[in-house]
Curated annotation (Swiss-Prot):
Organism: Listeria monocytogenes serotype 4b (strain CLIP80459)
Complex formation: Homodimer. Homodimerization may be required to stabilize the binding of ScpA to the Smc head domains. Component of a cohesin-like complex composed of ScpA, ScpB and the Smc homodimer, in which ScpA and ScpB bind to the head domain of Smc. The presence of the three proteins is required for the association of the complex with DNA.
A Pfam family that the UniProt record links to this protein: SMC_ScpB
Chain segments carrying region Disordered: 168-198
Family, similarity comment: Belongs to the ScpB family.
This protein's record includes keyword Cell cycle: yes
Keyword Metal-binding: no
One GO process term, biological-process aspect: chromosome separation
Name of the protein in question: Segregation and condensation protein B
Purpose of the protein: Participates in chromosomal partition during cell division. May act via the formation of a condensin-like complex containing Smc and ScpA that pull DNA away from mid-cell into both cell halves.
Subcellular location: Cytoplasm
GO CC annotation: cytoplasm
Amino acid sequence: MNREEQLGVLESLLFAAGDAGLSTEQLTEVMEITHIEALNLLELLSDRYNGSADRGLILLELAGTFQLATKKAHAEFLRKLVEVPSNTVLSQASLETLAIIAYRQPVTRMEVDEVRGVQTDGPIRTLVAKGLVTDKGRVDGAGRAKLYVTTSEFLDAFGLNSLEDLPKLADPATDEPDQNEMDLFFDRFNQSKEQEEE
């Protein structure tokens, strides 16, 4: 693999890792390169992002991990995007992600990914932007991934007084909600949204 291909792989890995970021150890293992090669690739990618006004991303190093982030210069536009009222309902992926977080909180994105079997960075960003989920600290250890929990807005949106009002599972630590429980969960959300519109 040549240098340009390595940069493409690196960028893909950083994107897929989301806000959990990647350590140089993870990069060396996944890309099968040396520590020095990983640092050189990270520096080259960072220079490309920083050296070009037409790029919307930067490479950050936080708590020993590297992650992609948006440029501060674009903050005004990102804020507008979040503030624009959205009449769209949550996607199935977002609803499933929300149910997993509700039942297993506090939970990391990687744990949610494992339950759903697919990457959930997008749905989690949507849920955070809509105020249904927030991060509440980080796990100890390598990577220091964010822990996600539901908010009081989540309780309001689903007409719940507390998390104890969620449909019961046999064992929330191991069981996933069955389809009937998920339907009840989503029906409560849709009913509360219809009441808001009246």
